[in-house]
């Protein structure tokens, strides 16, 4: 069976840390910021670590060879 390719869209959205955790940009920051709380806007800056089950799914299905 041929080697599974890394999904190009996942390459751009996720990074795998040295310890195997998956980092991604926080959701909900595209528009509609006027009705968001200041705390939400602050917390959604930068990247966040995905929950362990979600991270495992991302790596298994979209990033089989890591990054």
From Swiss-Prot:
A GO biological-process term: translation
GO molecular function: structural constituent of ribosome
Keywords: Ribonucleoprotein, Ribosomal protein
Entry's Gene Ontology cellular component terms: cytosolic large ribosomal subunit
Record has Ion transport as a keyword: no
KW Ribonucleoprotein (keyword) present: yes
Pfam annotation, one family: Ribosomal_L35p
SUPFAM superfamilies per the UniProt record, alphabetical: L35p-like (SSF143034)
InterPro entries, A to Z: Ribosomal_bL35 (IPR001706), Ribosomal_bL35-like (IPR021137), Ribosomal_bL35_CS (IPR018265), Ribosomal_bL35_sf (IPR037229)
Gene3D superfamilies associated with the record: 4.10.410.60
PANTHER family: 54S RIBOSOMAL PROTEIN BL35M, LARGE RIBOSOMAL SUBUNIT PROTEIN BL35M
Family: Belongs to the bacterial ribosomal protein bL35 family.
Protein name (record): Large ribosomal subunit protein bL35
Gene: rpmI
